[in-house]
């Protein structure tokens, strides 16, 4: 396991998530509900805890209030430590004014003092908006064994989707020889997962160089990594095999929730050897009435089910009244589904009230996912 004095994690959690539409109107993307009882950020924080990483800086910016309240002091993930633990790092004001994070590299650069107080040998940089399980200590062992300056976790994606990602072109030793940001004609299908391990000395040097460059967009993928390659630093690709999902769109968020219902899913929430931790909602047990019918679904605590629920994910405190059908759908916390409602292939946002007799399904394209949320 990683020793906290050797490796400090910096978790980027300030993204707006605009492609999630109304779900992120008043909520940071990492705080979006997922999987019946979790938030997206739970997966990265649980990975840190399970990997033995005990010092985590969480960099927030967009609509941070609910995310800050949710994280608290990190006790849900066993990260409430006297030394280290979780520290929330929002942008702050200097004499010259508030300095907003302008890119991923800018966010880390503006929190160099946080890293300096620990003076780690390695810095693990993470994104708080992906769904996956990963042992970061194995990646660190790989980084050390390869004597790398930077290691980047990569995953094979379908060739017809490779142009959507930052693509790493490597040699036979998995050394990265070229980085292409969303190439039209990709040479490789190794996509960056946005997970980096830097030697601390290298990170300091190149973040300072990037900050001095007036033409930089202050982004790791666009600016810092290409600069490292140009200067001959050793960048290594770390191949990851397992479930990984970028839930940046309404459809991909729905797909990831549906993946949990598959018998052969690579993402198992009931794996006691690698638990996914979350904040307990403290709701009473769910109630399934005699009029209810539930098949192949995740029903969280506090739910009252009087209608039919099939192949769906229901969060805490959801009510489905008699005569209603919820099929292939995700219903987020506190939503109330009235009587004789039909909901099919949809996401119902937190606290939404669906009136009696409503029919919610896509009429134009059966491949669409309908989003019902405040602000739509």
From Swiss-Prot:
It catalyses: alpha-D-glucose 1-phosphate + ATP + H(+) = ADP-alpha-D-glucose + diphosphate. GO terms for molecular function: ATP binding; glucose-1-phosphate adenylyltransferase activity. It comes from the Bacteria. Pfam families: Hexapep_GlmU, NTP_transferase. Keywords: ATP-binding, Carbohydrate metabolism, Glycogen biosynthesis, Glycogen metabolism, Nucleotide-binding, Nucleotidyltransferase, Transferase. Pathway: Glycan biosynthesis; glycogen biosynthesis. Its EC number is 2.7.7.27. The keyword Nucleotidyltransferase applies. CDD domains: ADP_Glucose_PP (cd02508), LbH_G1P_AT_C (cd04651). GO terms for biological process: glycogen biosynthetic process. InterPro entries: ADP-Glc_PPase, ADP_Glu_pyroP_CS, GlgC_bac, GlmU/GlgC-like_hexapep, NTP_transferase_dom, Nucleotide-diphossugar_trans, Trimer_LpxA-like_sf. Alpha-D-glucose 1-phosphate binds at residues 101, 166, 181-182, 192. Belongs to the bacterial/plant glucose-1-phosphate adenylyltransferase family. Homotetramer. Involved in the biosynthesis of ADP-glucose, a building block required for the elongation reactions to produce glycogen. Catalyzes the reaction between ATP and alpha-D-glucose 1-phosphate (G1P) to produce pyrophosphate and ADP-Glc. HAMAP family: GlgC. This is Glucose-1-phosphate adenylyltransferase. The lineage of its organism: Bacteria, Bacillati, Bacillota, Bacilli, Bacillales.
């Amino acid at each position: 396991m990683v020793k906290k004095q050797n490796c400090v994690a910096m978790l980027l959690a300030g993204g707006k998530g605009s492609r999630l539409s109304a779900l992120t109107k008043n909520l940071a993307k990492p705080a979006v509900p997922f999987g019946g009882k979790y938030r997206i950020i739970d997966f990265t924080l649980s990975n840190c805890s399970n990997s033995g990483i005990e010092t985590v800086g969480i960099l927030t910016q967009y609509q941070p209030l609910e995310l800050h309240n949710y994280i608290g002091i990190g006790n849900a993930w066993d990260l409430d430590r006297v030394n280290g633990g979780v520290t929330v790092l929002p942008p702050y004001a200097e004499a010259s004014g508030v300095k907003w994070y302008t890119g991923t590299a800018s966010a880390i650069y503006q929190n160099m003092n946080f890293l300096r107080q620990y003076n780690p040998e390695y810095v693990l940089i993470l994104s708080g908006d992906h769904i996956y399980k990963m042992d970061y200590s194995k990646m660190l062992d790989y980084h050390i064994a390869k004597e790398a300056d930077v290691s980047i976790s990569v995953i094979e994606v379908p060739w017809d989707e490779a142009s959507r990602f930052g693509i790493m072109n490597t040699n036979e030793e998995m050394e990265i020889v070229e980085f292409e940001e969303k190439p039209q004609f990709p040479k490789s299908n190794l996509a960056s997962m946005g997970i980096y391990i830097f030697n601390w000395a290298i990170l300091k040097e190149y973040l300072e160089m990037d900050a001095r460059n007036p033409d930089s967009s202050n982004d790791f993928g666009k600016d810092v990594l290409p600069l490292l390659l140009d200067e001959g630093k050793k960048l290594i690709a770390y191949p990851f095999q397992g479930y990984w999902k970028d839930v940046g769109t309404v459809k991909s968020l729905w797909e990831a929730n549906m993946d949990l219902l598959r018998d052969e899913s690579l993402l198992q929430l009931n794996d006691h050897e690698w638990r996914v931790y979350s904040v307990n909602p403290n709701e009473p047990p769910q109630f399934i009435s005699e009029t209810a019918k539930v098949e192949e679904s995740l029903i969280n605590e506090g739910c009252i089910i009087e209608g039919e629920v099939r192949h769906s994910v229901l969060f805490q405190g959801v009510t489905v009244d008699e005569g209603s059908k919820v099929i292939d759908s995700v219903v987020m916390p506190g939503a109330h589904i009235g009587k004789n409602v039909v909901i099919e292939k949809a996401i119902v946002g937190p606290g939404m009230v669906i009136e009696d007799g409503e029919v919610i399904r896509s009429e134009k394209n059966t491949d669409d996912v309908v989003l019902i949320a405040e602000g739509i």
